[in-house]
Amino acid sequence: MTSSSMTIAALATAPAAGAVGILRLSGPEALDVGRLLAPGVPAQPTPRHAYLASFVDAEGRSLDEGLFLYFRGPQSFTGEDVVELQAHGSPRLLRLLLTRALEDARVRHAAPGEFTRRAFLNGRLDLTRAEAVADLVAADSEAAVRAAAAGLSGALASRVQALEEPLRALHADMEGVLSFPDEAEGADEDVGERVTALRAQAETLLAEVGRGRLVRRGARVALFGPVNAGKSTLFNRLVGEARALVDDEPGTTRDALEARVEWDGLAVTLFDTAGLRETPGRVEALGIARTRALLTGVDLAVLVLPPGVTQAEVEAWTRDVGGTPVLVVDGKCDVAEVSSSPRQRVSGLTGEGVDALRDDMLGRLWGGGTPSAVALVSERHADALRRASEALGRAESASRVSTLEVVSGEVGLALEALGEVSGTVVSEALLDAIFQRFCIGK
């Protein structure tokens, strides 16, 4: 029996004390081995039926009493026979049960992500859904949970399929013309138009990468600006607690402070940075240097200004951020005179304008979209989509100046790249790279 067809076993719950712990087996011997641990279960148990059973050691002594569940393949998560033993969540007890299962020569320990990998290989999940399992396990915000759940239900798969199927049909039409030119006359008349439309679809999906990245790792937002502009007070107000020291003396904040918040389901790491000024002390200058380095790596920089700042000064402050998007606000509006400035006015002290500022920041981060519309397009997906789009761009150009054979070749390359997203074209090395990020037992 090959390693890939052996029965595998692993703990499906975290190795920590809890109310319930689960031992999972999948493969041709899952039921036999499961019944060695729970001999009171019938030889032909009813699939998807929970049996109250005694779990025993090799000498038949009871270790625990729990639930035994059998899922007959192919109607199971992995597409194989699956058995789950749900015991009390003692790490030592669960380790004893796992060790007992692994003592059987027909069983080996599952590799990271191997249960989900078998589900993919057995056609139970496409690759985007399989990756969504890992996204859901790793999700640490409401937006990440909802986006991963949408991926698991096929949101990304359906969009990839909507691009892949007409692309495959186009490729088949062109290959038909090339192979049987007399019988397929006229089948290639609209090739250029079809390629252009499909490239636009690929670009639309590729545009989701930035927002998908936000959902996966959370957003990074930095407050910056001149000293005594009210940044630290505003930071404390946005965080909801007094994290930053507030004082009228310039240079109070020397190291960037950070706090994690969740706004409308999106995880946001907020930074309060050292105030910028022309003649700081030596230690303060180090903080300012760190601020400038930080500003180039965040998703949004919020420039907080004191009263009376001119537009020329605003432009001078924004030179520090590189290509980072900047939102400019007037701080300390509670002490400033009402002005005709179009900038947003906020006060960290009173809370005036803070809710509107938070909404504006979220709007900038989402790029005008909504969290519910985010497709979890990963960096791996982005690389494949980028190659597909580039191939379609070359096909579009070739449709005007070159032969149908060249166009068909480029469309074929685009199909191969898309296949890496859906899983229709995938290597063992790629599968290894994808499933290694899963935890064992998933």
From Swiss-Prot:
InterPro entries attached to this UniProt entry: G_TrmE, GTP-bd, GTP-bd_TrmE_N, GTPase_MnmE, MnmE_dom2, MnmE_helical, P-loop_NTPase, Small_GTP-bd
Record has Cytoplasm as a keyword: yes
Amino-acid positions noted as binding GTP in the UniProt annotation, renumbered to this chain: 228-233, 247-253, 272-275
Annotated localization: Cytoplasm
GO biological process: tRNA methylation; tRNA wobble uridine modification
Organism ancestry: Bacteria, Pseudomonadati, Myxococcota, Myxococcia, Myxococcales
Amino acids binding Mg(2+): 232, 253
Organism in which the protein naturally occurs: Myxococcus xanthus (strain DK1622)
One Pfam family of this chain: TrmE_N
Subunit structure: Homodimer. Heterotetramer of two MnmE and two MnmG subunits.
Transmembrane found in the keyword field: no
Task of the protein: Exhibits a very high intrinsic GTPase hydrolysis rate. Involved in the addition of a carboxymethylaminomethyl (cmnm) group at the wobble position (U34) of certain tRNAs, forming tRNA-cmnm(5)s(2)U34.
Name the UniProt record assigns to this protein: tRNA modification GTPase MnmE
Alphabetical UniProt keywords: Cytoplasm, GTP-binding, Hydrolase, Magnesium, Metal-binding, Nucleotide-binding, Potassium, tRNA processing
Binding site for (6S)-5-formyl-5,6,7,8-tetrahydrofolate: 24, 84, 124, 442
Any one GO MF annotation of this record: metal ion binding
Known EC number: 3.6.-.-
Gene: mnmE
